[in-house]
């Protein structure tokens, strides 16, 4: 497995992966890294938006067959190492308990709530939990 910055040529495959994982596809202005298998096919990606000393985690997607292998953790650490944020924020579906557990393991804490934030295919809406990560100060 290789982690590398995504290129414009990767975007179609990442958009397909995003749809399969029910997350927003990365945009051309986002900072995106992907984890690829030996053939170069994307297994996972993380998309972030840095602003000053903060980072917004916009999307984190892992192919179902590639989950529970540490890809999300490795991608998150790659983004943190590259962007060096003091603080990071994200929104996650209230029903996505697996993602919430992952984010808690990565050091995120519950920070707020957004009512009716996510649209559902049936026209209903779902709440989002806002989570916050804080860098550990180094001396």
Predicted features, each with a name:
Residues 72, 76, 96-99, 116-122:
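Short glycine/proline-centered loop/turn elements that form peptide/ligand docking sites
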Residues 83-94:
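Conserved GNAT acetyl-CoA-binding A-motif
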Residues 2-69, 73-82, 133-138:
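Acetyl-CoA-dependent GNAT
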Residues 89-91, 109-130:
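Conserved catalytic-core motifs of GNAT/GCN5-like acyltransferases
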Residues 54, 58, 91, 100, ...:
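Residues lining the SAM
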Residues 83, 105-106:
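Structural motif
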């Amino acid at each position: 497995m290789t982690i590398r910055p995504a290129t414009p040529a990767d975007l179609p495959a990442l958009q397909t992966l995003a749809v399969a994982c029910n997350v927003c596809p990365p945009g051309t202005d986002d900072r995106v890294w992907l984890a690829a298998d030996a053939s170069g096919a994307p297994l996972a990606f993380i998309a972030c938006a840095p602003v000053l000393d903060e980072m917004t985690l916009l999307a984190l997607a892992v192919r179902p067959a590639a989950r529970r292998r540490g890809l999300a953790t490795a991608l998150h650490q790659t983004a943190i190492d590259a962007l060096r944020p003091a603080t990071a924020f994200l929104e996650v579906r209230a029903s996505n308990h697996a993602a919430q557990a992952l984010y808690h393991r990565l050091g995120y804490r519950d920070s707020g709530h957004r009512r009716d934030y996510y649209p559902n295919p049936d026209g209903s809406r779902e709440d989002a939990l806002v989570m916050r990560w804080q860098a550990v100060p180094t001396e």
